[in-house]
Curated annotation (Swiss-Prot):
<feature type="topological domain" description="Cytoplasmic">
    <location>
        <begin position="319"/>
        <end position="374"/>
    </location>
</feature>
<keyword id="KW-1133">Transmembrane helix</keyword>
<comment type="function">
    <text>Involved in the translocation of nascent protein chains into or through the endoplasmic reticulum (ER) membrane by facilitating the proper chain positioning at the SEC61 channel. Regulates the exposure of nascent secretory protein chain to the cytosol during translocation into the ER. May affect the phospholipid bilayer in the vicinity of the lateral gate of the SEC61 channel, thereby facilitating ER protein transport. Intimately associates with transmembrane (TM) domain of nascent membrane proteins during the entire integration process into the ER membrane.</text>
</comment>
<feature type="transmembrane region" description="Helical">
    <location>
        <begin position="298"/>
        <end position="318"/>
    </location>
</feature>
<feature type="topological domain" description="Cytoplasmic">
    <location>
        <begin position="98"/>
        <end position="121"/>
    </location>
</feature>
<feature type="transmembrane region" description="Helical">
    <location>
        <begin position="30"/>
        <end position="50"/>
    </location>
</feature>
<keyword id="KW-0653">Protein transport</keyword>
<dbReference type="InterPro" id="IPR006634">
    <property type="entry name" value="TLC-dom"/>
</dbReference>
<feature type="region of interest" description="Disordered">
    <location>
        <begin position="334"/>
        <end position="374"/>
    </location>
</feature>
<feature type="glycosylation site" description="N-linked (GlcNAc...) asparagine">
    <location>
        <position position="56"/>
    </location>
</feature>
<keyword id="KW-0811">Translocation</keyword>
<feature type="transmembrane region" description="Helical">
    <location>
        <begin position="160"/>
        <end position="180"/>
    </location>
</feature>
<dbReference type="GO" id="GO:0005789">
    <property type="term" value="C:endoplasmic reticulum membrane"/>
</dbReference>
<feature type="topological domain" description="Cytoplasmic">
    <location>
        <begin position="181"/>
        <end position="192"/>
    </location>
</feature>
<feature type="transmembrane region" description="Helical">
    <location>
        <begin position="218"/>
        <end position="238"/>
    </location>
</feature>
<comment type="similarity">
    <text>Belongs to the TRAM family.</text>
</comment>
<dbReference type="Pfam" id="PF03798">
    <property type="entry name" value="TRAM_LAG1_CLN8"/>
</dbReference>
Length: 374
């Protein structure tokens, strides 16, 4: 494996190139400041806001729930500090995966610049989607979402969350916020930035919406479903870069993508359109976190439906482009045998090809001309 030679001239401190080359180390130092702040009593109160989850409530043990009391969490303005800290952690993890995994594979495969950037994007996203799917599935199983689907809308508002649930949403927001500085760190092309901003903005809009409107149960199920389909796409693209004949993963992804959009719409309509619409408490109450009113329900369903329609439109365009490229690349060349007839006209037609196309017999070889002259 070739070792990259480090340039003798180091860029000036705090210059553009210096920040790009050492951004992971700089961010690590900033994160370390918050962790060191926990060690001193004067700064511990401020540092703990960034590092640990805030707004916990301890519920006493009941007769149904034996033995121990439980700690639940709700959201507040201090969550922004926690999201900021874990955004720094996401930048560090991103750099570790890039340097110790993706860069090593890139040096072995010798990708072009276009494939290099797409491979890095799929490598980072496939790792994140896989981790989020496993984590989200664990929460779904531990909190009995699979055995009792009515928990999606029953006992709304779901303003109290378990530690795993709140930490999951904090991590999701932190990851997608970290994608903004990564556009600068990864030297994203100007023409690709608008597409990336729309992509990141849609994730933040829906995750933050589910978190703030106390629809965290529905949001978790939809995220796990969506992330699984996206993971399959990006892992298939990684295999495609190593072997361009690989198409099985894309075929499976195409089927699951459509099914995922249908399941998303069904679960959303079932939860918001029927479950919450039949709930007894339908009054807007900010203090209790109750947003179960007609206007909010319509806005939630409209945003989900518009997003799914936008994704289907992008999917159809993507599939049409792939099929068009595949058909032009593998278009069969039909060869017709020239009809041998007497006279000069048939010989002239053979030289010019059949039906305007040049064939393998389009011109006599020197050997044939010699035989004819003899």
């Amino acid at each position: 494996m070739a070792i990259r030679k480090k340039s003798t001239k180091s860029p000036p401190v705090l210059s553009h190139e210096f920040i790009l080359q050492n951004h992971a180390d700089i961010v690590s130092c900033v994160a370390m400041v918050f962790l060191l702040g926990l060690m001193f009593e004067i700064t511990a109160k401020a540092s703990i806001i960034f590092v640990t989850l805030q707004y916990n409530v301890t519920l006493p043990a009941t007769e149904e729930q034996a033995t121990e009391s439980t700690s639940l969490y709700y959201y507040g303005i201090k969550d922004l500090a926690t999201v900021f800290f874990y955004m720094l952690v996401a930048i560090i993890i991103h750099a570790i995966i890039q340097e110790y995994v993706l860069d090593k594979i890139n040096r072995r495969m010798h990708f072009s610049k276009t494939k290099h950037s797409k491979f890095n994007e799929s490598g980072q996203l496939s790792a994140f989607y896989l981790f989020s799917c496993i984590w989200g599935t664990f929460i779904l199983i531990s909190e009995n979402y699979i055995s009792d689907p009515t928990i999606l809308w029953r006992a709304y508002p779901h303003n109290l969350m378990t530690f795993q649930m709140k930490f999951f949403y904090i991590a999701q927001l932190a990851y997608w916020f970290h994608a903004f500085p990564e556009l600068y760190f990864q030297k994203t092309k100007k023409e690709d930035i608008p597409r990336q901003l729309v992509y990141i903005g849609l994730y933040l809009f829906h995750i933050a919406g589910a978190y703030l409107l106390n629809l965290n149960h529905l949001g978790l199920v939809l995220l796990v479903l969506h992330y699984f389909v996206e993971f399959l796409f990006h892992i298939s693209r990684l295999f495609y870069f190593s072997d361009e004949k690989y198409q099985k993963g894309f075929s499976l992804w195409a089927v699951l993508f459509v099914l995922g959009r249908l399941l998303t719409l069904i679960l959303s309509v079932l939860t918001v359109g029927f479950g919450l619409a039949r709930a007894e408490n339908q009054k807007l109450d900010f203090s209790a976190g109750n947003f179960n009113v007609l206007a909010v329900r319509i806005a939630v369903l409209a945003s989900i439906c518009i997003t799914q329609a936008f994704m289907m439109w992008k999917f159809i365009n993507f599939q049409l482009r792939r099929w068009r490229e595949h058909s032009t690349f593998q278009a069969p060349v039909v060869k017709k045998k020239p009809t041998v007839t007497k006279g000069r006209s048939s010989r002239k037609g053979t030289e010019n090809g059949v039906n305007g196309t040049v064939t393998s017999n389009g011109a006599d070889s020197p050997r044939n001309r010699k035989e004819k002259s003899s």
